[in-house]
Amino acid sequence: NGIIYDSHVYPWKTVDWDEAVTVIADKYPILIGELGHYGDDAKPVEGPQPESSRIWVPKVLDWIDKHNYHMTAWCFHPTAGPCIIKSFDNEPTDFYGVYIKEFLEKKMQ
């Protein structure tokens, strides 16, 4: 049908993701085109992050995996956030990047 549904999943969005995304998954392929968390001490301009990254990031990745969605994590740059890496040596951020790295490593097995 040539249609793919793309959603950007962030903790400051007060959205029921199952209601907004999963409801159409049987009709269209799903891409979570962006997701991320700035870390527990951050105050992003987009709004508050009501859940800790230790809770929110694994929960969202489990949701993506459970539904077999495709995803891209935002952002592979140390100064554009939410940052997956601390610097260009590719060391993952403790609050977000470590979870993405672990998720991708499991997918590669």
Specify the residue positions occupied by each region the protein language model found:
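Extended, charge-rich low-complexity interaction segments
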Residues: 98-109
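Extracellular glycoside hydrolase catalytic/binding regions
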Residues: 1-69, 85-95, 105
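Short, solvent-exposed turn/loop segments enriched in Gly/Ser/Thr/Pro and often Arg
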Residues: 73-81
